Amino acid sequence: MALNLKINRQIRAPKVRLIGSSGEQLGILNTKDALDLAREADLDLVEVASNSEPPVCKIMDYGKYRYDLTKKEKDSKKAQHQVRIKEVKLKPNIDEGDFSTKLKQARAFIEKGNKVKITCMFRGRELAYPEHGHRVVQKMSQGLEDIGFMESEPKLNGRSLICVMAPGTVKTKKKQDKINAQDEKQ
Protein backbone atom coordinates (compact mmCIF):
# COMPACT_ATOMS: atom_id res chain seq x y z
CA MET A 1 0.00 0.00 0.00
CA ALA A 2 1.59 3.26 -1.13
CA LEU A 3 0.56 6.46 0.64
CA ASN A 4 1.91 9.49 -1.18
CA LEU A 5 0.97 12.00 1.49
CA LYS A 6 3.33 14.77 2.49
CA ILE A 7 3.84 15.16 6.22
CA ASN A 8 5.34 17.90 8.40
CA ARG A 9 8.45 19.44 6.74
CA GLN A 10 7.67 17.81 3.36
CA ILE A 11 4.83 20.30 2.86
CA ARG A 12 6.27 23.12 0.70
CA ALA A 13 3.18 25.34 0.25
CA PRO A 14 3.45 28.77 1.95
CA LYS A 15 -0.15 28.65 3.24
CA VAL A 16 -2.48 25.74 3.99
CA ARG A 17 -6.15 25.25 4.82
CA LEU A 18 -6.01 23.56 8.22
CA ILE A 19 -8.37 20.98 9.71
CA GLY A 20 -7.98 20.20 13.41
CA SER A 21 -7.50 16.76 14.92
CA SER A 22 -11.22 16.48 15.76
CA GLY A 23 -12.29 17.58 12.26
CA GLU A 24 -13.00 21.28 12.89
CA GLN A 25 -11.98 23.90 10.30
CA LEU A 26 -9.18 26.14 11.59
CA GLY A 27 -8.96 28.30 8.46
CA ILE A 28 -6.05 29.29 6.23
CA LEU A 29 -2.72 29.55 8.07
CA ASN A 30 0.96 29.84 7.27
CA THR A 31 2.56 26.40 7.01
CA LYS A 32 4.96 27.27 9.84
CA ASP A 33 2.05 28.18 12.17
CA ALA A 34 0.22 24.97 11.21
CA LEU A 35 3.36 22.94 11.98
CA ASP A 36 3.66 24.67 15.36
CA LEU A 37 0.01 23.80 16.19
CA ALA A 38 0.61 20.16 15.20
CA ARG A 39 3.80 20.00 17.26
CA GLU A 40 1.99 21.47 20.31
CA ALA A 41 -0.65 18.76 20.02
CA ASP A 42 2.15 16.17 19.64
CA LEU A 43 0.69 15.12 16.28
CA ASP A 44 1.67 15.35 12.59
CA LEU A 45 0.60 17.82 9.91
CA VAL A 46 -0.56 15.73 6.93
CA GLU A 47 -1.39 17.12 3.48
CA VAL A 48 -4.64 15.36 2.52
CA ALA A 49 -5.57 17.33 -0.64
CA SER A 50 -2.62 18.78 -2.53
CA ASN A 51 -4.57 19.69 -5.68
CA SER A 52 -6.69 22.42 -4.05
CA GLU A 53 -5.55 26.01 -3.54
CA PRO A 54 -4.30 26.34 -0.81
CA PRO A 55 -3.58 22.64 -0.03
CA VAL A 56 -5.73 21.06 2.67
CA CYS A 57 -3.80 19.75 5.67
CA LYS A 58 -5.03 17.90 8.73
CA ILE A 59 -3.54 17.53 12.18
CA MET A 60 -3.44 13.79 12.97
CA ASP A 61 -1.27 10.95 14.20
CA TYR A 62 0.19 9.78 10.89
CA GLY A 63 1.53 6.47 12.24
CA LYS A 64 -1.88 5.54 13.63
CA TYR A 65 -3.54 6.64 10.37
CA ARG A 66 -1.27 4.35 8.31
CA TYR A 67 -1.81 1.48 10.77
CA ASP A 68 -5.61 1.86 10.53
CA LEU A 69 -5.48 1.91 6.72
CA THR A 70 -3.36 -1.25 6.52
CA LYS A 71 -5.60 -2.97 9.07
CA LYS A 72 -8.73 -2.09 7.05
CA GLU A 73 -7.06 -3.37 3.90
CA LYS A 74 -6.15 -6.68 5.56
CA ASP A 75 -9.67 -7.06 6.97
CA SER A 76 -11.22 -6.46 3.55
CA LYS A 77 -8.91 -9.08 2.03
CA LYS A 78 -9.92 -11.57 4.73
CA ALA A 79 -13.60 -10.88 4.08
CA GLN A 80 -13.23 -11.75 0.41
CA HIS A 81 -13.65 -15.44 -0.26
CA GLN A 82 -12.21 -16.54 -3.55
CA VAL A 83 -14.14 -19.45 -4.96
CA ARG A 84 -11.81 -21.93 -6.54
CA ILE A 85 -12.81 -24.57 -9.04
CA LYS A 86 -11.52 -28.01 -8.12
CA GLU A 87 -11.66 -30.85 -10.63
CA VAL A 88 -12.64 -34.48 -10.20
CA LYS A 89 -11.80 -36.70 -13.18
CA LEU A 90 -13.75 -39.87 -13.90
CA LYS A 91 -13.94 -42.51 -16.62
CA PRO A 92 -17.25 -43.88 -17.94
CA ASN A 93 -16.43 -47.41 -16.74
CA ILE A 94 -15.33 -46.43 -13.21
CA ASP A 95 -15.57 -49.09 -10.50
CA GLU A 96 -17.87 -48.56 -7.49
CA GLY A 97 -15.02 -48.22 -4.96
CA ASP A 98 -13.19 -45.67 -7.07
CA PHE A 99 -16.44 -43.80 -7.63
CA SER A 100 -17.14 -43.56 -3.90
CA THR A 101 -13.60 -42.20 -3.34
CA LYS A 102 -14.12 -39.54 -6.02
CA LEU A 103 -17.53 -38.71 -4.53
CA LYS A 104 -15.97 -38.19 -1.07
CA GLN A 105 -13.29 -36.01 -2.63
CA ALA A 106 -15.87 -33.86 -4.45
CA ARG A 107 -18.00 -33.63 -1.29
CA ALA A 108 -14.98 -32.34 0.68
CA PHE A 109 -14.32 -29.69 -1.98
CA ILE A 110 -17.93 -28.45 -1.92
CA GLU A 111 -18.05 -28.44 1.89
CA LYS A 112 -14.99 -26.15 1.87
CA GLY A 113 -16.95 -23.74 -0.36
CA ASN A 114 -15.25 -24.55 -3.67
CA LYS A 115 -16.93 -25.33 -6.96
CA VAL A 116 -16.28 -28.77 -8.42
CA LYS A 117 -15.74 -29.45 -12.11
CA ILE A 118 -16.74 -33.04 -12.84
CA THR A 119 -14.93 -34.32 -15.93
CA CYS A 120 -15.72 -37.69 -17.46
CA MET A 121 -12.95 -38.52 -19.94
CA PHE A 122 -13.56 -40.89 -22.84
CA ARG A 123 -10.77 -43.02 -24.29
CA GLY A 124 -10.75 -44.81 -27.61
CA ARG A 125 -14.16 -46.20 -28.59
CA GLU A 126 -15.79 -45.16 -25.30
CA LEU A 127 -16.90 -41.98 -27.11
CA ALA A 128 -19.33 -44.11 -29.14
CA TYR A 129 -21.40 -44.53 -25.95
CA PRO A 130 -21.67 -41.06 -24.35
CA GLU A 131 -24.70 -42.21 -22.33
CA HIS A 132 -22.32 -44.17 -20.05
CA GLY A 133 -20.51 -40.92 -19.23
CA HIS A 134 -23.81 -39.10 -18.72
CA ARG A 135 -24.89 -41.82 -16.30
CA VAL A 136 -21.66 -41.51 -14.23
CA VAL A 137 -21.86 -37.69 -14.11
CA GLN A 138 -25.56 -37.85 -13.19
CA LYS A 139 -24.81 -40.34 -10.41
CA MET A 140 -22.08 -38.02 -9.08
CA SER A 141 -24.38 -34.97 -9.13
CA GLN A 142 -27.13 -36.94 -7.33
CA GLY A 143 -24.61 -37.91 -4.65
CA LEU A 144 -23.79 -34.23 -4.11
CA GLU A 145 -27.24 -32.64 -4.48
CA ASP A 146 -27.78 -32.41 -0.69
CA ILE A 147 -24.86 -29.94 -0.34
CA GLY A 148 -24.55 -28.49 -3.84
CA PHE A 149 -26.37 -27.89 -7.09
CA MET A 150 -25.49 -28.37 -10.73
CA GLU A 151 -24.38 -24.97 -12.00
CA SER A 152 -23.95 -26.09 -15.60
CA GLU A 153 -25.51 -29.05 -17.35
CA PRO A 154 -23.16 -31.81 -18.61
CA LYS A 155 -21.67 -30.84 -21.99
CA LEU A 156 -19.56 -32.91 -24.34
CA ASN A 157 -16.34 -31.01 -25.01
CA GLY A 158 -13.99 -32.94 -27.30
CA ARG A 159 -13.35 -36.27 -25.56
CA SER A 160 -14.68 -35.08 -22.19
CA LEU A 161 -18.09 -34.66 -20.62
CA ILE A 162 -17.96 -31.69 -18.25
CA CYS A 163 -20.33 -30.23 -15.65
CA VAL A 164 -19.84 -27.86 -12.70
CA MET A 165 -21.29 -28.28 -9.21
CA ALA A 166 -21.48 -25.29 -6.84
CA PRO A 167 -21.94 -25.21 -3.05
CA GLY A 168 -25.44 -24.46 -1.77
CA THR A 169 -28.82 -25.97 -2.41
CA VAL A 170 -31.31 -25.86 -5.24
CA LYS A 171 -33.33 -23.38 -3.15
CA THR A 172 -30.33 -21.05 -3.12
CA LYS A 173 -30.07 -21.34 -6.90
CA LYS A 174 -33.79 -20.65 -7.33
CA LYS A 175 -33.52 -17.57 -5.10
CA GLN A 176 -30.54 -16.35 -7.14
CA ASP A 177 -32.43 -16.95 -10.41
CA LYS A 178 -35.41 -15.01 -9.00
CA ILE A 179 -33.15 -12.07 -8.01
CA ASN A 180 -31.54 -12.10 -11.46
CA ALA A 181 -34.97 -12.09 -13.13
CA GLN A 182 -36.05 -9.09 -11.02
CA ASP A 183 -32.85 -7.24 -11.92
CA GLU A 184 -33.49 -7.87 -15.63
CA LYS A 185 -37.03 -6.44 -15.32
CA GLN A 186 -35.67 -3.21 -13.87
From Swiss-Prot:
Keywords, alphabetical = Cytoplasm, Initiation factor, Protein biosynthesis
Instruction: Name where it's found.
Output: Cytoplasm
Q: What function does this protein fulfil?
A: IF-3 binds to the 30S ribosomal subunit and shifts the equilibrium between 70S ribosomes and their 50S and 30S subunits in favor of the free subunits, thus enhancing the availability of 30S subunits on which protein synthesis initiation begins.
**What does the annotation say about its assembly with partners?**
Monomer.
Which SUPFAM superfamilies did the record assign?
Translation initiation factor IF3, C-terminal domain, Translation initiation factor IF3, N-terminal domain
Q: Which family does it belong to?
A: Belongs to the IF-3 family.
Could you state a single Gene Ontology molecular function term?
A: translation initiation factor activity
Main location per the UniProt record = cytoplasm
InterPro entries associated with the record: T_IF-3_C_sf (IPR036788), T_IF-3_N_sf (IPR036787), Translation_initiation_fac3_CS (IPR019813), Translation_initiation_fac_3 (IPR001288), Translation_initiation_fac_3_C (IPR019815), Translation_initiation_fac_3_N (IPR019814)
Its source organism is Chlamydia caviae (strain ATCC VR-813 / DSM 19441 / 03DC25 / GPIC) (Chlamydophila caviae)
Q: Which HAMAP family match?
A: IF_3
Provide one Gene Ontology biological process annotation. Answer: ribosome disassembly
Gene Ontology cellular-component terms listed: cytosol; membrane
Name assigned to this protein: Translation initiation factor IF-3
